[in-house]
Amino acid sequence: MVKFAVVVFPGTNCDFETERAIRKAGAEAERVWYKTSLKDFDGVVLPGGFSYADYLRAGAIAARQEIIEEVKEFARDGKPVLGICNGFQVLTEAGLLPGALRPNKVPRFICRWVHLRVADTETPFTQFYEPGEVIRMPIAHAEGNYYADDPSKVRIAFQYSDEEGNITEEANPNGSLLNIAAIANENGNVLGTMPHPERASDRFLGSEDGLKLFRSMVEWARK
């Protein structure tokens, strides 16, 4: 059975539910302290939270820890690397994904459910979705305003939308460029998402739309 590492930095707070979602998707998962080696794992997830209390910038200090060099090796080897919320911020700070995540257009913490339109189903994380499918996941961030100098080089996975899938300014909770909610690297094996799929992985939580992401990731890692 494939096994995923859920990396825990000081300030990480979404590791338990992320571990549970991966297990529910059919893989082994283990919470790994950031000073631990990743050599025995098939994929890695950087979960949400406030690593190092978001000092300097969200994700900036975590991105400079030694374990990130191993994460970069995973990415180079084509293994799945997923960053959720703060994990997405870490991936951009580490240069594993293009662009940056800036403070929300309205400068406050936003915590609510959003609708997303699936823009790319050709990544290891989105292969179980339908093109243009509208899904629901929660967001919880103060710095989720995605920006890139050259949007044409950004591989968009999810976009904020209304419940019909229309990409509108009103549906954009944070001012993110092109309503971007999640992006992948050029090869597709690194994904960063501001919405929390682990919080949408159980019908009792209001949605199982995020579970598809984990099942897609697990199925791809088995190949």
UniProtKB/Swiss-Prot annotation:
Gene Ontology terms describing biological process: 'de novo' IMP biosynthetic process
Catalytic activity as recorded in UniProt: N(2)-formyl-N(1)-(5-phospho-beta-D-ribosyl)glycinamide + L-glutamine + ATP + H2O = 2-formamido-N(1)-(5-O-phospho-beta-D-ribosyl)acetamidine + L-glutamate + ADP + phosphate + H(+); L-glutamine + H2O = L-glutamate + NH4(+)
SMART domains in the record: GATase_5
InterPro entries: Class_I_gatase-like, PRibForGlyAmidine_synth_PurQ
Stretches assigned to the Glutamine amidotransferase type-1 domain: 4-223
Alphabetized UniProt keyword annotations: ATP-binding, Cytoplasm, Glutamine amidotransferase, Hydrolase, Ligase, Nucleotide-binding, Purine biosynthesis
Pathway the protein takes part in: Purine metabolism; IMP biosynthesis via de novo pathway; 5-amino-1-(5-phospho-D-ribosyl)imidazole from N(2)-formyl-N(1)-(5-phospho-D-ribosyl)glycinamide: step 1/2
Alphabetical list of CDD domains matching this protein: GATase1_FGAR_AT
Pfam families per the UniProt record, alphabetical: GATase_5
HAMAP family: PurQ (MF_00421)
Name the UniProt record assigns to this protein: Phosphoribosylformylglycinamidine synthase subunit PurQ
Gene: purQ
